[in-house]
């Protein structure tokens, strides 16, 4: 519910599926009542292993409060997960217009992870494909309950954050998690960002397409760590 869509704007829909038998799925963007269908497409899911499917949706009308609907008619055992909807022109999973607005603000230093999220985030989850990063329950559910039913998600990883900082011209400021992550895991994060390709985690960064160290100079220990 409550998805703002723009007329003629292509969106990328994705989800993972496993089924006992072939099932035709229908994906649509509609009004809140489901009476107006702005766009609709179908695909066939088949197989007992998780398989990712992506389709493009282009609504023929704008709606600030649209619904995303996934349906199927055939009876059977169906599992779905990792549902996502992004503008086709997204920047590393972020809305392009928001990134442009951040440029205009002239942000000089950008901190991440921020707030209570910093006390839950595990940077190593970001090494997995986004569909394989487990959600985690927020210890301050009051903040996230209205939006994500009390859960946070690791949809942005270290490489995405550095790309954002470079795009908007900001100095990256990374907050490590000394509460749940070990000193060794946090040291590995520093090495991933700043080590050259001769170090284990610098080599991993290079293997992921980023040969030169990120040279992150600003680091902090947790968020409100005294509480």
Task: Give the ranges of each region predicted by the language model.
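Alpha-helical scaffolding within the catalytic cores
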Residues: 93-97, 153-161, 196-211
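Catalytic-domain carbohydrate-binding cleft regions of carbohydrate-active enzymes
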Residues: 154-155, 161, 168, 178-197, ...
